[in-house]
Regions:
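Conserved N-terminal segment of class I S-adenosyl-L-methionine
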Residues: 1-96, 102-106, 118-121, 167, ...
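Short catalytic micro-motifs in class I SAM-dependent methyltransferases
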Residues: 107-111
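A short glycine-rich, Lys/Arg-flanked "PGG" loop and its adjoining helix->strand segment in the class I
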Residues: 118-130
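Conserved beta-strand signature within the Rossmann-like core of class I S-adenosyl-L-methionine
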Residues: 131-138
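A C-terminal cap/extension of S-adenosyl-L-methionine-dependent methyltransferases
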Residues: 135, 151-153, 186-236
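Short "lid" loop at the C-terminus of a central beta-strand within the Rossmann-like core
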Residues: 140-144, 191-193
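Acceptor-substrate binding/catalytic loop of class I
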Residues: 157-173
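A SAM-dependent methyltransferase catalytic signature shared across enzymes that methylate proteins
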Residues: 172-189
Length: 236
């Protein structure tokens, strides 16, 4: 995309602007977002220079801009386009087969419908070379607090309103779907085990209680208990 291309914002970006560039410290998931970025940066930092990377569903392209000087990285998003971000659907990625060595898909799949999710994973599998790897982050519908809520009240706690996360699932279902798409699970990391009461406190005062958030993730990193899961996948 030429450097003179204007920035185009649709959907939530039209209403809120480039809100991921300076996230609100009062956002209830601010500590989880920062912990995720730290883990993703660690993964990207280990890649050799000029590795071809796709950030699928990259939003404003925060990581694309950050790593453009070292990696051959580009982004796609359904609601954003700029110099380094191409506007396109994740279910129809505008790239030939086996284009990329690595790919990111961070907090994206839950925004797709149940019907769209397997198509998006199939597209990621198609555009990544054999042996290539994909790092996926997804919220887990069956996190610890949600399970307790189900036992007491008979329903799980959605990770966001249905209109925002129409594809909300337990992480086990994402893993099954990834396997059907042809991916092998290399590693799995949990962020923010939702211990009841403590979770409510953190979500009410996210910036102030960030040390508590970090302590919980360090002491109880059981992925199935965590609100967010990072799935490190490999194309077989």
């Amino acid at each position: 995309m030429p450097a003179s291309s204007p920035v185009v914002r649709d959907g939530e970006y039209a209403a809120r602007g480039d809100y991921h560039r300076e996230p609100d410290p009062n956002w209830e998931f601010y500590p989880t977002y920062l912990a995720k970025l730290k883990a993703v940066r660690s993964w990207l930092d280990r890649l050799p220079q000029d590795t071809r990377v796709l950030d699928a569903g990259c939003g404003e392209g925060v990581l694309v801009d950050e790593y453009a000087g070292r990696l051959a990285i580009e982004g796609v998003d359904a609601n954003y386009s700029s110099e380094r971000v191409r506007q396109a659907s994740l279910t129809e990625l505008p790239y030939p087969d086996n284009t990329f060595d690595r790919a990111l898909c961070l907090d994206v799949l839950e925004h797709l419908t149940f019907e769209q999710q397997p198509k998006a994973l199939a597209e990621l599998h198609r555009v990544v070379r054999r042996g290539g790897e994909v790092l996926v982050s997804v919220p887990n519908l069956a996190h610890l607090q949600s399970r307790v809520h189900f036992l007491l009240l008979g329903r799980l706690i959605r990770t966001a309103a249905e209109a925002k996360h129409p594809g909300d699932r337990p992480v086990a279902e994402y893993l099954e779907m990834a396997a059907r798409a042809g991916f092998q699970l290399v590693d799995r990391q949990g962020i923010f085990p939702t211990v009841p009461v403590l979770t409510r406190m953190i979500r009410k005062s996210p910036a102030r209680l960030m040390p508590l958030h970090r302590a919980l993730t360090r002491l109880l990193p059981v992925p199935g208990w965590c609100f967010l899961n990072l799935l490190h996948l490999r194309k077989a």
